[in-house]
Amino acid sequence: MVQNDFVDSYDVTMLLQDDDGKQYYEYHKGLSLSDFEVLYGNTADEIIKLRLDKVL
């Protein structure tokens, strides 16, 4: 059996701010890095904080 040490699964927490200054959180569980790239690219509001946690 071959062991794969590359884990491509992350929980993402983002603090966003809209054009009116309202801040809100979004949570996304179990995203691959490719999914995160799409999410990041499609986020219209400003990202204030970003946290990626590797799923073990």
Curated annotation (Swiss-Prot):
Instruction: Give the gene symbol.
Output: 0.8
Which keywords fit this entry according to its UniProt record?
A: Early protein, Host-virus interaction
Subunit (UniProt): Homodimer. Interacts with host UDG; this interaction inhibits the uracil-DNA glycosylase.
Per its database record, what is this protein's job? Inhibits the host uracil-DNA glycosylase (UDG), an enzyme which removes uracil residues from DNA by the base excision repair. Interacts with host uracil-DNA glycosylase and prevents the latter from binding to DNA. Since the viral DNA polymerase efficiently incorporates dUMP into DNA, the virus needs to prevent the deleterious effect caused by host UDG when it eliminates uracil residues present in the viral genome.
Record Pfam families: UDG-inhib_P56
Q: Name one GO biological process term.
A: biological process involved in interaction with host
Q: Which family does it belong to?
A: Belongs to the phi29likevirus protein p56 family.
| Name the record gives this protein | Protein p56
Superkingdom of the source?
A: Viruses
- InterPro entries with a match to the protein in the record: P56 (IPR049384), UDG_Inhib_phi29likevirus (IPR053744)
